[in-house]
């Protein structure tokens, strides 16, 4: 994959629950703590190294932000770091929360 792909929250939910991809949330710590997808890895500048050690480059990665805009830059960055398959989630956490209100966790 030379370019990241934009996917819907429904596609992301399906990939996540099939174990086909990992989910990273790039929002600020306060927003993440107030609500995030339960399986999301909170990806920040400080946690990037740990993420890259934990997940091989052949791991498919889905990037979630607030509304689906910032995730595009982060998805491109992960591709440049060597990840083979990267997806940006359209609508971000706002869409996730709207579609899957029961699938939201709180805390860091």
Swiss-Prot record:
The active site is at 65 (cysteine persulfide intermediate). It holds the Pfam family Rhodanese. It is found in: Cytoplasm. Its EC number is 2.8.1.1. One of its GO terms (molecular function) is thiosulfate-cyanide sulfurtransferase activity. Residues 17-105 form the Rhodanese domain. PANTHER family: FAD-DEPENDENT OXIDOREDUCTASE, THIOSULFATE SULFURTRANSFERASE GLPE. Belongs to the GlpE family. This is Thiosulfate sulfurtransferase GlpE. It comes from Salmonella arizonae (strain ATCC BAA-731 / CDC346-86 / RSK2980).
């Amino acid at each position: 994959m030379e370019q990241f792909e934009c996917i819907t929250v429904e596609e992301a939910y399906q990939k996540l629950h099939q174990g086909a991809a990992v989910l990273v949330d790039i929002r600020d710590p306060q927003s993440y703590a107030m609500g995030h997808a339960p399986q999301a890895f909170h990806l920040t500048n400080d946690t990037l190294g740990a993420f890259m050690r934990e997940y091989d480059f052949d791991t498919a990665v889905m990037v979630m932000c607030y509304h689906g805009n910032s995730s595009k830059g982060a998805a491109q960055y992960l591709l440049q770091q060597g990840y083979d398959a990267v997806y940006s989630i359209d609508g971000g956490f706002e869409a996730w929360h709207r579609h899957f209100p029961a699938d939201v966790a709180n805390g860091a």
